[in-house]
Amino acid sequence: VSLRLSCAALLCALAAPALAETPAYGPELEGFDYGWPVARFNFETQRQPMQMAYIDVHPDKPNGRTVVLLHGKNFCAGTWDTTLRTLRDAGYRVIAPDQIGFCKSTKPERYQYSFQQLAQNTHALLEKLGVKKATVIGHSTGGMLATRYALMFPDETEQLVMINPIGLEDWKAKGVPAQSVDAWYQRELKTSAQSIRKYEQNTYYAGQWKPEYDRWVTMLAGMYQGAGKEKVAWNSALLYDMIYTQPVVYEFGQLKMPTLLLIGNKDTTAPGKDAAPPEVQKTLGDYPALGKAAASAIPHATLVTFDDLGHAPQIQAPERLHKALLDGLNALK
């Protein structure tokens, strides 16, 4: 018994420093370095001054095309790191913004979040940068935003790419119960490095974990450790409400541009699934079926699947994902 107690005490002692070492970042990710120069777009929206952080990378040998990378709910412009390098080296200009409410961008006390508003913000940034036409790539929640952007600005979207997008189903219609913004807020205040890592390991990486994933856990957890954690949690709650209440799946048939779907079939993401009855949970996040359904609904879609990958294939298996991505982009030429 004493040996068991000693081992348990040792495990606790080893775990404690890891918890204590979670850094405290500012509400706009002050203190966390993406490893890329970050610029800021200052503009006014909904009677408030805002700043949108973004990365703008120019290639040494440009091929004349621009790609816009739209991050997911638990991701930032910086998590596109390997994708940024790959596309730059292939000749693309690459622009990766942090949306309002996320990461290094403004987190307002009050904001009427909608995918339309985020698309308009992104379009304003591209206008400021002189980009008249782009290929839009969205991952996770960024896939819903990319869809909305393409629907609103079809003539300026030469190609649409979605990497494990959420929103391939309507969770509300399938039986996921509504949660108030206040409930989401209380839930988000409990966010920790441990909860993030557990969720990401199960959902993003199909049960696997590599040391390089820890950087992205630290990035997210650090915002919930700092002095502005309430503002971070509040904006996160508002964004979850947007995601739940604003489906895009019913408009897939209106997409006019060539669309590439890159799907890790081990993904099981479905926001709010844990609050749904067990019989409903079983029907959600079936990405093998959802990917096929989306490809059938979108007029000019190409579907590429990865049977062993989860929600973040560009991080889990970057070489494989990026080969499929570059092949899909080259097919437009």
Where are these regions (language model features)?
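Catalytic active-site module of serine/aspartate enzymes centered on a nucleophile-bearing elbow/loop
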Residues: P288-K333
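Conserved HGGG/HGGXW glycine-rich cap/lid loop of the alpha/beta-hydrolase fold
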Residues: Q46, M50-K104
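Flexible "cap/lid" loop of the alpha/beta hydrolase fold
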Residues: T147, L151, E158-T191
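N-terminal cap/lid segment of alpha/beta-hydrolase-fold proteins
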Residues: P27-V57
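N-terminal signal peptide c-region/cleavage motif recognized by signal peptidases
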Residues: A15-P17
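Active-site loop/oxyanion-hole signature of alpha/beta-hydrolase fold enzymes
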Residues: E44-Q48, I55-K61, Q99-I137, T141
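Conserved serine/cysteine hydrolase catalytic core
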Residues: Q225-S296
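Conserved alpha/beta-hydrolase catalytic His-Asp/Glu region
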Residues: T191-G253
